[in-house]
């Protein structure tokens, strides 16, 4: 898939308007062998879609997002999210196979209210 970052941002905007369309867009982008590695769990396919929807349903806000790298096989970005009154800087990487998201890892840390993506080295 070309322009993964653009597609990702469009998916997020769709979630605010049409949850079913959002779910369909995610599902269509996942490889049959998809795995999502979180801090404490390994999640597959529909479980990941449910996890993402639970986050949004519980008030997740993506405050800012920055593309770090993208090519045919790799998609890497950082974002600042807010949930439960706390802000987190997350690092997200996807590995693509056969034009679909095959593996995904996310890590994060809490940041202050005045932290911005511009503070990341290399910005």
Protein language model features and the residues they cover:
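Terminal "cap-and-tail" regions of soluble proteins that handle hydrophobic small molecules
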Residues: 1-19, 28, 100-102, 112-123
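A solvent-exposed, acidic/Ser-Thr-rich amphipathic alpha-helical stretch
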Residues: 2, 19-71
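Functionally constrained cores in energy, signaling, and assembly domains
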Residues: 4, 9, 23, 44, ...
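A beta-strand edge to alpha-helix "cap/lid" segment located at domain peripheries
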Residues: 51-123
């Amino acid at each position: 898939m070309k322009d993964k970052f653009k597609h990702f941002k469009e998916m997020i905007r769709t979630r605010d308007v049409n949850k079913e369309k959002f779910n369909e867009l995610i599902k269509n982008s996942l490889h049959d062998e998809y795995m999502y590695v979180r801090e404490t769990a390994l999640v597959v396919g529909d479980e990941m879609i449910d996890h993402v929807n639970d986050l949004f349903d519980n008030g997740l806000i993506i405050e800012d997002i920055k593309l770090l790298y993208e090519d045919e096989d790799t998609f890497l970005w950082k974002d600042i999210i807010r949930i439960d009154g706390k802000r987190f800087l997350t690092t997200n990487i996807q590995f693509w196979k056969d034009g679909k998201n095959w593996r995904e890892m996310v890590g994060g840390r809490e940041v202050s209210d005045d932290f911005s993506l511009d503070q990341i080295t290399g910005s």
